[in-house]
Amino acid sequence: MKILYLLFAFLFLAFLSEPGNAYKQCHKKGGHCFPKEKICLPPSSDFGKMDCRWRWKCCKKGSGK
């Protein structure tokens, strides 16, 4: 029975992370999601959280250092 619970949880998580739907707002601005600890250079390229996952932020591509 435990195996069924684990299998269901795995399948549920697999369908949640479809790459086609990930971070559309950030990508439309030419950005990419980085961990919040990363510094966006220049600071004007930091778009904030937008639609990135929890504790991540959107920076213009190539600016995450």
Curated annotation (Swiss-Prot):
Tissue expression summary: Expressed by the venom gland.
GO biological process, one term: killing of cells of another organism
Major localization listed first in the record, in broad terms: secreted
Residues annotated as transmembrane: none
Chain ranges for the short sequence motif Nuclear localization signal as given in the UniProt record: 24-40, 49-61
Site (described: Involved in the interaction surface toward Kv): Y23, K24, R55, W56
Domain of life where this protein originates: Eukaryota
Disulphide-bonded residues: C26-C58, C33-C52, C40-C59
Subcellular location: Secreted
Keywords, sorted A to Z: Antibiotic, Antimicrobial, Disulfide bond, Fungicide, Ion channel impairing toxin, Myotoxin, Neurotoxin, Pharmaceutical, Potassium channel impairing toxin, Secreted, Signal, Toxin, Voltage-gated potassium channel impairing toxin
GO cellular component: extracellular region
This protein's record includes keyword Disulfide bond: yes
Entry-linked InterPro entries: Myo_ane_neurotoxin_sf, Myotoxin
Signal peptide: 1-22
An example Gene Ontology molecular-function term: toxin activity
Secreted as UniProt keyword: yes
Pfam families linked: Myotoxins (PF00819)
Assembly behavior: Monomer.
Extra information: Negative results: has no hemolytic activity. Has low harmful effects on normal mammal cells. Does not show activity against the filamentous fungi A.fumigatus and T.rubrum at concentrations up to 125 ug/mL. Does not directly affect voltage-gated sodium channels Nav1.1/SCN1A, Nav1.2/SCN2A, Nav1.3/SCN3A, Nav1.4/SCN4A, Nav1.5/SCN5A and Nav1.6/SCN8A.
UniProt record similarity statement: Belongs to the crotamine-myotoxin family.
Known function: Cationic peptide that possesses multiple functions. It acts as a cell-penetrating peptide (CPP), and as a potent voltage-gated potassium channel inhibitor. It exhibits antimicrobial activities, hind limb paralysis, and severe muscle necrosis by a non-enzymatic mechanism. As a cell-penetrating peptide, crotamine has high specificity for actively proliferating cells, and interacts inside the cell with subcellular and subnuclear structures, like vesicular compartments, chromosomes and centrioles. It penetrates into the cells as fast as five minutes after its addition to cell culture medium.
Name of the protein this chain belongs to: Crotamine
